[in-house]
């Protein structure tokens, strides 16, 4: 890790994700040659959220590139929780379906946690079932949520030292921030590779002065709150690695067009950081790539379990 720099090295998540997808395509060919059936991922969208449609479309493109069979099931926003649960139960029982993801968010009348927990643990490629979250927390074998797993892969690819380093995770979502903190502090005694960082979690109730203080002490900052420009230049230690998970759609006043930005003031922070991820093109592509990783992993486990039973 560099601790002094005139300008941060931009972490090209798009290029790294392409490497991962290429590796996975090669791995899948090996699996099929060994007699494994083709993995099949089913995505479920409830309602007509344009962002959800785009995210799922990107996942389907990645499936085709890797060689994974896939389909998208679209349900109207009026779908009841019971109807969605029945669909998930049917997919759980279908041996041809090896991966299931329910694109979040779901309509307000549907309980997100209930839906995540309804997905079979072994087919839960998002890693959102409470069993997978619990296994991740205990450093056990699990389907780890794709975004924090993608961040971990980025850090490893860039050879960012984590052993004994101070890491700050800004945000406390159960699907991203919590498993991210868990991965950063993992000691490697069980299934999860050690990262051995000293981890601090900050959130909306962390006073701004305290947030700034914690960030200034951090060698690694991972921010995922959905607040444009939250992390500023004065909050970052020179040479720190800044990972921006935020995705915010804002209007560019100079052009009148909408654009995507993260939670980090990118142009300012890159002047002091050692490494930084852009938005778009940073964490997002890695999330999709690691979802493909989880899908292959899930398919292999299910086939192996059937052979041994």
From Swiss-Prot:
GO function terms (MF aspect): magnesium ion binding; methenyltetrahydrofolate cyclohydrolase activity; methylenetetrahydrofolate dehydrogenase (NAD+) activity; methylenetetrahydrofolate dehydrogenase (NADP+) activity; phosphate ion binding
Cofactor(s) annotated in UniProt = Mg(2+)
Extract the InterPro entries matched here.
Aminoacid_DH-like_N_sf, NAD(P)-bd_dom_sf, THF_DH/CycHdrlase, THF_DH/CycHdrlase_cat_dom, THF_DH/CycHdrlase_CS, THF_DH/CycHdrlase_NAD-bd_dom
Name any one Pfam family assigned in the record: THF_DHG_CYH
Give the UniProt keywords, A-Z. Hydrolase, Magnesium, Mitochondrion, Multifunctional enzyme, NAD, One-carbon metabolism, Oxidoreductase, Transit peptide
The primary site where this protein sits is mitochondrion
Q: Where in the cell is it found?
A: Mitochondrion
GO cellular component, alphabetical, reads: mitochondrion
Question: So which domain of life are we looking at?
Answer: Eukaryota
Catalytic activity reported: (6R)-5,10-methylene-5,6,7,8-tetrahydrofolate + NAD(+) = (6R)-5,10-methenyltetrahydrofolate + NADH; (6R)-5,10-methenyltetrahydrofolate + H2O = (6R)-10-formyltetrahydrofolate + H(+)
For this protein, what is the EC number? 1.5.1.15, 3.5.4.9
Family under the similarity heading: Belongs to the tetrahydrofolate dehydrogenase/cyclohydrolase family.
Q: Per its database record, what is this protein's job?
A: May play a role in spermatogenesis.
List other remarks.
This NAD-dependent bifunctional enzyme has very different kinetic properties than the larger NADP-dependent trifunctional enzyme and is unique in that it requires formation of an enzyme-magnesium complex to allow binding of NAD.
Q: How does it assemble?
A: Homodimer.
Protein name (database record): Bifunctional methylenetetrahydrofolate dehydrogenase/cyclohydrolase, mitochondrial
Please report the organism this UniProt entry assigns to the protein: Drosophila melanogaster
Species lineage? Eukaryota, Metazoa, Ecdysozoa, Arthropoda, Hexapoda
Question: Which gene is annotated as encoding this protein in its UniProt record?
Answer: Nmdmc
């Amino acid at each position: 890790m560099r601790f002094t720099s005139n300008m941060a090295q931009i972490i090209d998540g798009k290029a790294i994700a392409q490497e991962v997808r290429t590796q996975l395509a090669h791995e899948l060919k090996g699996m099929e040659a060994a007699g494994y059936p083709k993995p099949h991922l089913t995505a479920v969208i409830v309602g007509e959220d344009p962002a959800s449609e785009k995210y799922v479309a990107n996942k389907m493109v990645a499936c085709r590139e890797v060689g994974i069979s896939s389909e998208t099931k679209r349900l109207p926003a009026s779908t009841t929780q019971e109807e969605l649960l029945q669909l998930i139960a049917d997919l759980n029982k279908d041996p041809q379906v090896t991966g299931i993801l329910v694109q979040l968010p779901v309509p307000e009348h549907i309980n997100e946690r209930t839906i995540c927990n309804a997905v079979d643990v072994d087919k839960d490629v998002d890693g959102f079932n409470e069993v997978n979250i619990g296994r991740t927390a205990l450093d056990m074998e699990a389907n780890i949520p794709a975004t924090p797993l993608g961040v971990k892969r980025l850090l490893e690819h860039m050879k960012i030292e984590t052993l004994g380093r101070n890491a700050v995770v800004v945000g406390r979502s159960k699907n991203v921030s919590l498993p991210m903190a868990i991965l950063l502090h993992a000691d490697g005694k069980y299934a999860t590779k050690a990262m051995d960082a000293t981890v601090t979690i900050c959130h909306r109730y962390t006073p701004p002065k305290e947030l700034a203080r914690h960030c200034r002490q951090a060698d690694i900052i991972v921010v995922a709150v959905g607040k444009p420009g939250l992390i500023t230049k004065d909050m970052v230690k020179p040479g720190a690695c800044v990972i921006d998970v935020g995705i915010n759609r804002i209007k560019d006043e100079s052009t009148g067009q909408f654009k995507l930005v993260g939670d980090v003031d990118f142009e300012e922070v890159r002047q002091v950081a050692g490494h930084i991820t852009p938005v778009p093109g940073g964490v997002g592509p890695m999330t999709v790539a690691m979802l493909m990783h989880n899908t292959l992993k899930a398919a292999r486990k299910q086939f192996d379990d059937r052979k041994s039973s």
